[in-house]
Amino acid sequence: MIDLLQETDFDVRQLEGVEATDEQFDAPTERVTSPIPVLYQSGYLTIKGYDPEFQVYRLAYPNGEVRKGFIESLLPAYLELPGQSSTFYVVSFIRDLRKGDIESCLERTRSFFASIPNDLENKTEKHYQTIFYLLFRLMGMYVDSEVKSAV
């Protein structure tokens, strides 16, 4: 599933209320071009609403526990944290923030970016946004990046 997300270059930040049509759910597995049906079939997404006018389903994580578990499983696919699990890394980061230990937070952030392999083929701005989204989402923060506004 993680491979499918990366192969399709799907923006995981969009999973918080993604929409899908009947056609997306009916595609045979070998012709799936979107990870949405697979995430739904796997239980990572559930139907939260339906718009009968446009025949569109609104999908989201069924609960916070599923979202957290899914995001934890994604983090290692986007970066390597040598000798640490992503959960331990996030917990340490949160503890440093709560203590007001900004220097340790900055050091962790530097280490975090240093752990991203230099030879990534898809090392784009979106890749970095995804990493930050995953990290801060695991910390329990609501994250939006590049929000367009009229101001």
Predicted regions and their residues:
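Extended alpha-helical interface modules used as scaffolds for assembling large macromolecular complexes
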Residues: 1-151
